[in-house]
Amino acid sequence: MIGYNKFMKKFLAILVLGLFIAYYLFGLNELAVIFWAIAFCAGYVSLSASIRIWQKREIRKYHKKHKTIPRTYEDLEKHLKSSISVVSHLKKKLTLPNVTLLAATSVEIEEHQISLKISSQNIEFGAVKLLSSSLPEKKYSDIEYVSVKPMGRSDANRFLIEDLHKYFETSHCLYVEADGFVVNADLWKKEFLEFDYIGAPWPNEIQMDPNLVGSPGLPGPIPILNMKENCVGGGGFSLRSHKLLKTVSKINYDSLKFPIKNEDLLICHYLYKDMIDKGIRFAPPKLAAQFAIECDPLHLYGQDVNSVFGFHARHMRDYFLKEYMRRAPIGKW
């Protein structure tokens, strides 16, 4: 759909320009120019709407046909009949030698491995690492498996703040979780590496879900966070510099008294001013919106699934996995 939109916009622009050239150079009647311009614009809108309706119907049909989401990457390979590996060799990979792709987890280990494999399909990273307390059912030669202690939710947040910097040596790491991975490798921008932190932008206000916060049993109502000072951004699919992680590693996580201790909120919200004072650079929201999507795209920067490098959202995972199964075999991932 994105390719179609780009083509139609260019075609429409050239057409309107041609009409005005015809008017000025060949004396075409002014009313005729206006009529044809309006007619073609209306036709474009109508055709675009029809294509979108058709596309949504086809996606629904596809999802109905493929109800089962693969649990392991091996299952995913079997579903695709190994065609993804053939397609990968046909496409020129993006090379990011200064970025380590990594995940750190004690839960959903197979799902985290899927995120690593999909993210690295069309990108050659400096390294790819799975930091986990146990191994997945099948190991892959392009992933380095690193053993870490079992982690609960608070342990995971503490680990990302205090210890993550120890596990990579490149200038940046691309941190992914089970519900986030690269979806459009060709939308990588070199500007991403100019910043110490970039993640999907949040809304200006966040009503926290008590089941997802890093500090269970919070007294009183869950706060509404005002993110207007900095809305960048979601940690579940984020690019972080080694400088940033060395800086936050000096923080004693257990001593922090904030009501919510999710690591991305600590870095990007509660400790934002401290980070800025230490020379940490956060990507501007408009660039972050090109990096990843996490919230409802209708409310943030006109994002859609074809306009971002990656995503992070539990409610989007099944959709993107099905899109991957549909698009990867024909070289569209």
Annotate the PLM regions.
Residues A22-F35:
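Membrane-interfacial hairpin junctions
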Residues A32-F35, S50, K65-H172:
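N-terminal anchoring/stem segment of glycosyltransferases
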Residues S46-K64:
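Transmembrane-cytosolic junction motif
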Residues V128, A178-D179, S241:
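Generic structural signal for small/hydrophobic residues in well-ordered secondary structure
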Residues T170-F181:
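Short beta-strand-to-loop acidic/aromatic patch adjacent to the donor-nucleotide binding site
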Residues N184-P219:
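Conserved donor-nucleotide/metal-binding helix-loop-beta segment in metal-dependent transferases, i.e.
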Residues L212-K228, L244:
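Short, flexible, basic/aromatic active-site loop/helix in glycosyltransferases
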Residues N226-W333:
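Catalytic core and acceptor-binding pocket of nucleotide-sugar-dependent glycosyltransferases
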